[in-house]
């Protein structure tokens, strides 16, 4: 299938993140000239395996691994400049050219050390007070978005004006240090090594934060851009663009399992707001979903299995699927595929097609269970409800489907899959009402079954 020109594709996770978006974005960039991150921060983690070499990315779009592809960090991303340059330097050591191909929106809010301090201290305060932790990564994402919504954030463009930056920084420190000391008891809190250089007596200090920001400013200036303008000009010139979502739909701040969510909108609609490209220019929405479900951190998970006991299906998923977070290293909870959850994701994203990942992880399981709905307070429903409280009361309704013992690793043609694997995929299509466009059969870029190319003309 030949890709058309001037076609834009949005890639989103349909579950709780970790669906394998990085590999598929990398694969799709063969047909794209630009890749855009439009939300989240360095709490995201995308792993690519190319020719057996594993690369983990947190901020830079996955398209950076394709020579000649331009990469953009849109205004919807909250940016830790320090983490960005760590990532750039790591890629450059591996021989990847980054700086000439990366553009960073001047409208990105900055993540600064006091944001991470607030994040860590709040989780500690919740735990100390007996409340369940949200399960944040502790990287300051939520507090940075709070400053953005309150219209007090320091943004990338502020780095060009040191005096203005310094004045706004002092105002922010006065506010956030008050919260840290008065409400969170930061004077008695032991911050980790990464934050210690900025903190004295539980207070974040002006000088180390300002000095570091000014160092980053000089390195960042060549990459600062009006990303919205550049993307619209590229589209007008016939470029194919790929919009790379982070996390997943069920972590969306509005549509996820609130309050066990991230602090941004992870759904496809935010690709427009988070990049400055109008929604009429988004032509295909590809939903990435694992062949089973995983979740990191707290919050309800209707189809969760025992994933710690050897010999159980959940343990098989956890070990064969190597289910540990790219960013945090935390073990992911594992469970059966939830088609009722996917129906919710399909609705809020307007999915055009699905990509099923990690099908190969299910190899060897003789029987699979597919959640097709729930019983909630005595009533049968076929769509995931809104909010954590009702979701926690959902009892999954399963269909049992025969598994397969044959290996699917590396299969690249649909007809070469085991017959039971094909039946499993067909049932997912039937229950969710969304056609499968792609199937991933290993972490390797080339181990992909293409059924409908997202960049092909309709």
Curated annotation (Swiss-Prot):
* Residues at which GTP binds: 17-23, 45-47, 332, 358-360, 440-442
| InterPro entries named among the record's database cross-references | Adenylosuccin_syn_GTP-bd, Adenylosuccin_syn_Lys_AS, Adenylosuccinate_synth_dom1, Adenylosuccinate_synth_dom2, Adenylosuccinate_synth_dom3, Adenylosuccinate_synthetase, P-loop_NTPase
Give its localization.
Cytoplasm
A GO MF annotation of the entry reads: magnesium ion binding
- Organism of this sequence: Acidovorax ebreus (strain TPSY)
The protein's name in its UniProt record: Adenylosuccinate synthetase
Q: Which UniProt keywords apply?
A: Cytoplasm, GTP-binding, Ligase, Magnesium, Metal-binding, Nucleotide-binding, Purine biosynthesis
Q: How does it assemble?
A: Homodimer.
**Catalyses which reaction?**
IMP + L-aspartate + GTP = N(6)-(1,2-dicarboxyethyl)-AMP + GDP + phosphate + 2 H(+)
Where on this chain does IMP bind? Answer: 18-21, 43-46, 137, 151, 247, 262, 330
**Cofactor(s) required for function per UniProt:** Mg(2+)
GO CC terms: cytoplasm
Q: What pathway does the annotation place this protein in?
A: Purine metabolism; AMP biosynthesis via de novo pathway; AMP from IMP: step 1/2
Its function, per the record, reads:
Plays an important role in the de novo pathway of purine nucleotide biosynthesis. Catalyzes the first committed step in the biosynthesis of AMP from IMP.
């Amino acid at each position: 299938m030949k890709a058309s020109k001037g076609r834009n594709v949005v890639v989103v996770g349909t579950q709780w993140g970790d669906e394998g978006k990085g590999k598929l974005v990398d694969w799709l960039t063969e047909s794209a000239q630009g890749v855009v991150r439009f939300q989240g921060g360095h709490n995201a983690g995308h792993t690519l395996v190319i020719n057996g070499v594993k690369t983990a990315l947190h901020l830079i779009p996955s398209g950076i691994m394709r020579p000649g592809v331009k990469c953009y960090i849109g205004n919807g991303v909250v940016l830790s400049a320090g983490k960005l340059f760590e990532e750039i330097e790591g890629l450059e050591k591996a021989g990847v050219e980054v700086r000439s191909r990366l553009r960073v929106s001047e409208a990105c809010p900055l993540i600064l050390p006091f944001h991470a301090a607030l994040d860590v201290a709040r989780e500690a305060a919740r735990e100390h007070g007996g409340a369940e932790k949200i399960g944040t990564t502790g990287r300051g994402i939520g507090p940075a978005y709070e400053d953005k919504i309150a219209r007090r954030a320091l943004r990338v463009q502020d780095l060009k004006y040191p005096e203005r930056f310094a004045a706004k920084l002092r105002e922010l420190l006065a506010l956030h240090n008050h919260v840290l000391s008065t409400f969170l008891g930061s004077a008695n809190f032991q911050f980790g090594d990464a934050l210690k250089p900025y903190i004295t007596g539980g207070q974040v200090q002006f000088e180390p934060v300002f000095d570091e920001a000014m160092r980053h400013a000089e390195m960042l200036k060549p990459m600062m851009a009006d990303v919205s303008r550049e993307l619209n000009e590229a589209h007008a010139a016939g470029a194919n663009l790929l919009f790379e979502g982070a996390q997943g739909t069920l972590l969306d701040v509005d549509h996820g399992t609130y309050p066990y969510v991230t602090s941004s909108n992870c759904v496809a609609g935010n690709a427009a707001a988070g990049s400055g490209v109008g929604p009429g220019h988004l032509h295909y929405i590809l939903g990435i979903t694992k062949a089973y479900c995983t979740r990191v951190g707290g919050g309800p998970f209707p189809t969760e299995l025992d994933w710690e006991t050897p010999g159980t299906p959940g343990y098989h998923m956890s070990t064969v699927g190597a289910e540990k977070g790219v960013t945090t290293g935390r073990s992911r909870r594992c469970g059966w595929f939830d088609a009722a959850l996917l129906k919710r994701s399909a609705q809020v994203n307007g999915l055009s097609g699905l990509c099923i990942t990690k099908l190969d992880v299910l190899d060897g399981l003789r029987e699979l269970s597919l959640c097709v709905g729930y019983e909630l307070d005595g009533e049968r429903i076929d769509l995931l409800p809104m909010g954590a409280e009702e979701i926690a009361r959902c009892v999954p309704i399963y269909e049992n489907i025969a598994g397969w013992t044959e290996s699917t690793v590396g299969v690249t043609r649909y007809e070469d899959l085991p017959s039971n694997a094909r039946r499993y995929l067909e049932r997912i299509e039937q229950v969710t009402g969304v056609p499968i466009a792609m199937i991933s059969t290993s972490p390797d870029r080339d181990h992909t079954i293409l059924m409908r190319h997202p960049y092909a003309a309709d």
